[in-house]
A protein has these predicted regions:
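Class I SAM-dependent methyltransferase SAM/SAH-binding core
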Residues: 40-96, 120
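A short SAM/SAH-binding and catalytic strip from SAM-dependent methyltransferases
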Residues: 104-118, 141
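N-terminal, positively charged/glycine-rich alpha-helical extensions of SAM-dependent methyltransferases
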Residues: 1-11
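A short glycine-rich, Lys/Arg-flanked "PGG" loop and its adjoining helix->strand segment in the class I
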Residues: 119-134
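A short acidic, Gly/Pro-enriched loop at the edge of an enzyme's catalytic core
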Residues: 94-105
Length: 155
């Protein structure tokens, strides 16, 4: 029975089951967000880099740092072509290793509801986002129609 269990910390399982949703909804989310070009991005909970790839391919960022707590997922992300343009790191969203006001845009795609201390993670996102920057994300709306819910804040 244990062999049948797949975890999303396993990058291959994530890519197979969730990657297609991340691509589909991520495109809608980035259209909704309408980010400026040449921004400094932080992608929280990047997994295998599916959403990060959308950022790089559609938003013309100046820089992108993408973090995830799962080493296996980051290993897969680092093997992708976008890795040349992205700094992929294994990090904890609740203890970000970046200076205050480092990023123009901080995003989280289908992740915030899985973080154990969401308040701390959001506080960290606010800390590393520059004044007048954007913090945004989307999650599944489990209470209503199970579709995506988007939200953003400007610092």
């Amino acid at each position: 029975m244990a062999e049948d269990t797949q975890r999303f910390s396993d990058g291959t399982a994530y890519e197979q089951f969730m990657g297609r949703w991340t691509r589909a909804i991520g495109t809608i989310f980035l259209d909704w967000l309408a980010p400026p070009t040449d921004a400094r991005w932080l992608d929280i909970g990047c997994g295998t880099g599916v959403f990060t790839d959308l950022i790089v391919s559609t938003c013309s960022p100046a820089t992108v740092v993408a973090i995830d707590p799962s080493e296996p997922q980051i290993e897969i992300a680092r093997k992708k072509a976008i890795a040349q343009r992205v700094d992929f790191r294994v990090e904890d969203s609740q203890k970000l290793p970046f200076s205050d006001n480092t990023f123009d845009i901080v995003v989280s795609a289908l992740v915030i509801n899985f973080i154990s201390d969401r308040s701390q993670a959001l506080a960290e996102m606010c800390r590393v986002c520059r004044p007048h920057g954007v913090i945004a994300g989307y999650v599944w709306d489990f209470a209503a129609d199970r579709g995506p819910v988007c939200g953003s804040a400007r610092t």
